[in-house]
From Swiss-Prot:
Subcellular localization: Cytoplasm
Source lineage: Eukaryota, Metazoa, Chordata, Craniata, Vertebrata
Family recorded in the similarity comment: Belongs to the NBPF family.
Positions of the UniProt region annotated as Disordered: 162-200, 433-471, 722-746, 791-837, 1102-1136
Biased amino acid composition, Acidic residues: 165-177, 436-448, 801-810, 821-833
Annotated Pfam families: Olduvai (PF06758)
Name of the featured protein: NBPF family member NBPF1
Domain called Olduvai: residue spans: 165-259, 436-530, 707-799, 800-888, 891-946, 947-1038, 1041-1114, 1116-1214
Recorded superkingdom: Eukaryota
Tissue: Widely expressed. The only tissue which shows a weak expression is kidney.
Major location category of this protein: cytoplasm
Keywords, alphabetical: Coiled coil, Cytoplasm, Repeat
Note: Encoded by one of the numerous copies of NBPF genes clustered in the p36, p12 and q21 region of the chromosome 1.
Organism from which the protein derives: Homo sapiens (Human)
């Protein structure tokens, strides 16, 4: 059997075939072993048969009745087995024919869909051409009427493409009339009014026709071929009714494939009517004949196998009889042999029965599956027919719009009323495409829509006076998509949902009856479910199919007639069975004789002996081949069912998206009917509304097109977009409302690439995302591409609350910069296997910034590598600001973040969640780069910051009065981690960046918790101490006066520390007004404590200049204000800070062998800055570490060992 899996088959199916072959190899070895065992049993049976014949030869009268009874039972058993085998062969033949017919029909439907897409694309391009302004070389005197006529012609062509082939003859008259209408509509208006054409009554009657019968043909003359198949538990009755003109031989060939009814049926009848549809042709008939020819050799093979099995069964029965007779006469010498033979015989029968039951259950399952798919295809055909009828009605209505109004039919109808009629037809089309079970929910919506149509046909003065609102319920109900896209045609029909799930090594099938029925009916429905079998090899595939009441009385009558015809055939088969049984008996006797002669080495019968043994071996091989062939057929059916299921799933998704697009188009048409309101019109005219309609049509085409057509349609979409922009350029276009994406669709997607972080202004760059998932590692690459290749910026992942911030920014700039407090969600979790990092950087960028971003994330096994590179910013806007007026500086409110409280009992891996808040002002565009490495048990973090260039002179020429910015520092509470057993818990670094007009420094905190260490971080904000109050409200250039914090280092208590690695932090040069960094590093290696403190030369003038520095600062501010008023170029502010008093940590340790010191290094800073100081400490292998920052004090504690990093920035005056 050759099965075509359709266009969706892939390499996965091939891998499944290989897996099945691998699984069948052990079964082959097992079958070989069973063959050897059976061979031994056969030898014993032959001996038993010989003894039985000898007993019969000597005419033992005492066992004559027993022999007759045994032969009678043997005859009955053979008859039942033959009937069962014939029934299974017929069922397989029937399913093969059914699968081939379904495959051909699916191919034709795909071709129709492709042609329909091409026609819809042509229609869309024509509508786009209507929107574009007329050019001198393309107008050619055509007016709007002629273009609409061309559009109607394309719509007629689309209808023809969607219609079946055999409808062309019936629609010839309709096409001729349509062509005449088009010609009349394209003529001048004077000629049209002179020659008024009548609308044919036939077309109006066809619009009102609705087909209630779900199985009726599309047209009265269209032939149908109905297949009525009834499946019972052990009986299959199939009726093939050919309603076409054909010869008697063809009908007889169709009937020949029908099976013989079985007598043991016990389940309720499950009827299925299969409509071959109008798409079948003579090619399908040829395929059926070819299948019949191929099946004839298989029938001969089955007969031969039956003969062999009959001989084997007779031998087994004789052996059983001999064993019973020997047991009766108590032959002690062969008692053990008799018991073993009986036990083996019982086991053999049980295994064979179990195998037959398993195969029967699998066949029953596939029967149900094919049955449900056939019903679903029938319902889809009915939906297609109804859609064609509705499209024909809509086409006729459009033709009526093109025809000139007649005095007897106009009756005061204007364009508004005709549009209302079109909306009604569109609503009817949407109802046809929607499932039937939504009709009850949409009744209120339909009533409201009817009222709107009546209101829209009223005069415009009345409409403006009584403005109607669209109810929210109707909009919500329009967005509802029914998961059961294959419901019955009417809402009163019941639904039967069959949920079948295929797993790797088992098949679970469930039949759910969703109607009110008795318990017996539900139990009968469940009885057809199969037992889980071990031969399934496909992956998890879920399928929901619907069963509808499709049977009829005519099909039942056909079944009875076929049964009457098959009774003579059954009698003939029984007679053949009796003849074969007699031949089998003679063959068995010959086999017994041959074995006995071989035992006594009779040379005269040597040839006969060899032939009998050869036949025995051939029988075993044929049986094994038959089993393998059945397994192959089952596998092919499984592959076919899975491919059809994938195709149906994709079609359902396309249908759902098409319904959503049709709902949007219907709402747009309803908006055209509503009266124009003063706050919504905004200068919109008919051309702009048509442009919006074309956009919705393009969206519908994209939804209906398959995924592989996206690349082909890119150029078409670009041209369409350009045409829409050109057509809407002369007019004022309204702001388009962004559509909300439903949460269900976002949850179903594994990776959702949304455009929520698009550029706020035209200067923002484009970003491309490339994500690769592998088996045990995740490599994520975020590549930032833009016009400026030199600069890179961090990836912006906008949170959900960004829209609120954007709305606040649109209202206007906020004068003071106040910081808000926001608490992150608490994440309680008991068991996490792997928690991967999430980088969230909410950007707040101004229009003058041009930044680009690139981030690389990699998580491999136990390694996490994260790089954040924020490119520097160019100052190209300085010259523009000289020409423009003084713009107010935006004041933003930063969030105070409270880290999540993580409650966790067992965490295997908890990776970091870095969050960065970036806020840049007009004059500050720093370059920032961060690199996170979490590799095995190490955490590295580096912060690199470039120099911040400031062009204050240019800004102060245009903005003499620079407002001072007052900021409140962020209060950050680091996450409290409560954990019993942590394998690896990586840190959660959080960086807050806020740069005012003169530039603020960075703050960084790094901590790590490795193996079984517990980390607690406490961040203390910077404390500003400005003793002097600002006298003036707006000095030209504020000078900052800061006092450094006094930091007291904690005591470190440790008994045994082998190694403690700390995280270094690098500090680079800062501009004049920026605060410096301080870094400290601690190292203890092997039981050694290294402490190095390098203090630069501290001039003794520091203490004396403390108080004088404050006074001088106030004087310099006043002096700078006066100078700024004169020349508007104040000097750069100098920062005067107070030195920090540092208490060195007290280290208590029992066993410290060595203490290594690390020399400190000094970095040169600009004129107003002092030296940097760095202290370096290191601990290794049972670590103690502590981190304290000037801006952010962070404490880290670990379970048995601690990790400490101390960061401190100190300014030493020279």
């Amino acid at each position: 059997m050759v099965v075509s899996a359709g266009p969706w088959s892939s390499e996965k199916a091939e891998t499944n075939i290989l897996e099945i072959n691998e699984k069948l190899r052990p079964q082959l070895a097992e079958n070989k072993q069973q063959f050897r065992n059976l061979k031994e049993k056969c030898f014993v049976t032959q001996l038993a048969g010989f003894l039985a014949n000898r007993q019969k030869k000597y005419k033992y009268e005492e066992c004559k009745d027993l022999i007759k009874f045994m032969l009678r039972n043997e005859r009955q058993f053979k008859e039942e087995k033959l009937a069962e085998q014939l029934k299974q062969a017929e069922e397989l033949r029937q399913y093969k024919v059914l699968v081939h017919s379904q495959e051909r029909e699916l191919t034709q439907l795909r071709e129709k869909l492709r042609e329909g897409r091409d026609a819809s694309r042509s229609l869309n391009q024509h509508l786009q051409a209507l929107l574009t302004p007329d050019k001198p070389d393309k107008s050619q005197g055509q007016d709007l009427q002629e273009q609409l006529a061309e559009g109607c012609r394309l719509a007629q062509q689309l209808f023809q493409k969607l219609s079946p082939e055999n409808d062309e003859d019936e629609d010839e008259d309709v096409q001729v009339e349509e062509a005449e209408k088009v010609l009349e509509s394209s003529a001048p208006r004077e000629v049209q009014k002179a020659e008024e054409s009548k609308v044919p009554e036939d077309s109006l009657e066809e619009c009102a026709i609705t087909c209630s019968n779900s199985h009726s043909p599309c047209d009265s003359n269209q032939p149908h071929k109905n297949i009525n198949i009834t499946f019972e538990e052990d009986k299959v009755n199939s009726t093939l009714v050919v309603d076409r003109e054909s010869s008697h031989d063809e009908c007889q060939d169709a009937v020949n494939i029908l099976p013989v009814p079985g007598p043991t049926s016990s389940a309720t009848n499950v009827s299925m009517v299969v409509s071959a549809g109008p798409l079948s042709s003579e090619k399908a008939e040829m395929n059926i004949l070819e299948i019949n020819e191929k099946l004839h050799p298989q029938l001969a093979e089955k007969k031969q196998q039956f003969r062999n099995l009959k001989e084997k069964c007779f031998v087994t029965q004789l052996a059983c009889f001999l064993a019973n007779q020997q047991n009766k006469y108590k032959y002690e010498e062969c008692k053990d042999l008799i018991k073993s033979m009986l036990r083996n015989e019982r086991q053999f029968k049980e295994e064979k029965l179990a195998e037959q039951l398993k195969q029967a259950e699998e066949l029953r399952q596939y029967k149900v599956l094919v049955h449900s798919q056939e019903r679903e295809l029938t319902q889809l055909r009915e939906k297609l027919r109804e859609g064609r009828d509705a499209s024909r009605s809509l086409n006729q209505h459009l033709q009526a719009l093109l025809t000139p109004d007649k005095p007897d039919k106009s009756q005061g109808q204007d364009l508004q009323e005709q549009l209302a009629e079109g909306c009604r037809l569109a609503q009817q089309l949407f109802q046809k495409l929607s499932p039937e079970n939504d009709e009850d929910e949409d009744e209120d919506v339909q009533v409201e829509e009817a009222e709107k149509v009546l209101e829209s046909s009223a005069p415009r003065e009345v409409q403006k006076a009584e403005e109607s609102k669209v109810p929210e319920d109707s909009l919500e109900e329009c967005a509802i998509t029914c998961s059961n896209s294959h419901g019955p045609c009417d809402s009163n029909q019941p639904h039967k949902n069959i949920n079948i799930t295929f797993e790797e090594d088992k098949v679970n099938s469930a039949l759910v009856v969703d109607r009110e029925s008795s318990h017996d009916e539900c139990q009968d429905a469940v009885n057809i479910l199969p037992v889980p079998g071990p031969t399934s090899s496909a992956t998890n595939v879920s399928m929901v199919v619907s069963a509808g009441p499709l049977s009829s009385e005519k099909a039942e009558m056909n079944i009875l007639e076929i049964n009457e015809k098959l009774h003579p055939q059954l009698a003939e088969k029984k007679q053949q069975f009796r003849n074969l049984k007699e031949k089998c008996f003679v063959t068995q006797l010959a086999c017994f004789l041959a074995n006995q002669q071989n035992k006594y080495k009779n040379e005269e019968c040597k040839d006969l002996i060899k032939s009998m043994l050869r036949n025995e071996r051939q029988f075993k091989e044929e049986k094994l081949a038959e089993q393998l062939k059945q397994a192959e057929e089952l596998r092919q059916y499984k592959v076919l069912v899975h491919s059809q299921e994938r195709e149906l799933t994709q079609l359902r998704e396309k249908l759902r998206e098409g319904r959503d697009a049709s709902c949007s188009l219907n709402q747009h048409l309803q908006a055209l009917l509503t009266p124009d309101e003063p706050d919504k019109s905004q200068g919109q005219d008919l051309q702009e509304q048509l442009a919006e309609g074309c956009r919705l049509a393009q969206h519908l085409v994209q939804k209906l097109s398959p995924e592989n057509d996206n690349d082909d349609d890119e150029d078409v979409q670009v041209e369409v977009a350009e045409k829409v922009q050109k057509s809407s350029a002369p007019r004022e276009m309204p702001k388009a409302e962004e559509k909300e994406v439903p949460e269900d669709s976002l949850e179903e997607c594994a990776i959702t690439c949304s455009n929520s972080h698009g550029p706020y202004d035209s200067n923002q760059p484009h970003r491309k995302t490339k994500i690769t998932f592998e088996e045990d590692k995740v490599d994520s690459t975020l590549i930032g591409s833009s016009s400026h290749v030199e600069w890179e910026d961090a990836v912006h992942i906008i949170p959900e609350n960004e829209s609120d911030d954007e709305e606040e920014e649109e209202k206007g700039p906020v004068s003071p910069r106040n910081l808000q407090e926001s608490e992150e969600e608490e994440v309680p979790q008991e068991s996490w296997d792997e928690g991967y990092s999430t980088l969230s950087i909410p950007p707040e960028m101004l229009a003058s910034y041009k930044s680009y971003s690139g981030t690389f994330h990699s998580l491999e096994e136990q390694q996490v590598c994260m790089a954040v590179d924020i490119g520097g910013h160019r100052w190209d806007q300085v010259k523009k600001e000289d020409q423009e007026a003084t713009g107010p500086r935006l004041s933003r409110e930063l969030l105070d973040e409270k880290g999540p409280e993580v409650l966790q009992d067992s965490l295997d891996r908890c990776y970091s969640t870095p969050s960065g808040y970036l806020e840049l002002t007009d004059s500050c565009q720093p370059y920032r780069s961060a690199f996170y490495i979490l590799e095995q048990q190490r955490v590295g973090w580096a912060l690199d910051m470039d120099e911040i260039e400031k062009y204050q002179e240019v800004e102060e020429d245009q903005d003499p009065s620079c407002p001072r910015l007052s900021r409140e520092l962020l209060d950050e509470k680091e996450p409290e981690v409560l954990q019993d057993s942590l394998d690896r818990c990586y840190s959660t670094p959080s960086g807050y960046l806020e740069l005012p007009d003169l530039g603020q420094p960075y703050r960084s905190a790094v901590y790590s918790l490795e193996e079984q260490y517990l980390g607690l971080a406490l961040d203390v904000d910077r404390i500003k101490k400005d003793q002097e109050e600002e006298e003036d409200q707006g000095p030209p250039c504020p000078r900052l006066s800061r006092e450094l914090l006094e930091a007291v280092e904690p005591e470190v208590l440790q008994d045994s520390l082998d190694r403690c690695y700390s995280t270094p932090s690098s500090c680079l040069e800062q501009p004049d007004s920026c605060l410096p960094y301080g870094s400290s590093f601690y190292a203890l290696e092997e039981k050694h404590v290294g402490f190095s403190l390098d203090v630069g030369e501290i001039e003794k003038k520091g203490k004396g200049k403390k108080r004088r520095g404050r006074r001088s600062t106030k004087k310099r501010r006043r002096r700078g204000r006066k100078e700024g008023e004169e020349d508007q170029n104040p000097p750069c502010p100098r920062l005067s800070g107070m030195l920090m008093e540092v208490e060195e940590p007290e280290v208590l340790q029992d066993s410290l062998d060595r203490c290594y010191s690390t020399p400190s290094m000094y970095f040169e800073l600009p004129d107003s800055f002092q030296h940097y100081r760095s202290v370096f400490y290191s601990f290794e292998e049972q670590h103690i570490s502590f981190a304290l920052d000037v801006d952010n004090r962070f404490l880290t504690l670990m379970g048995t060992s601690l990790h400490l990093v101390f960061q401190m920035g100190v300014i030493f005056p020279q």
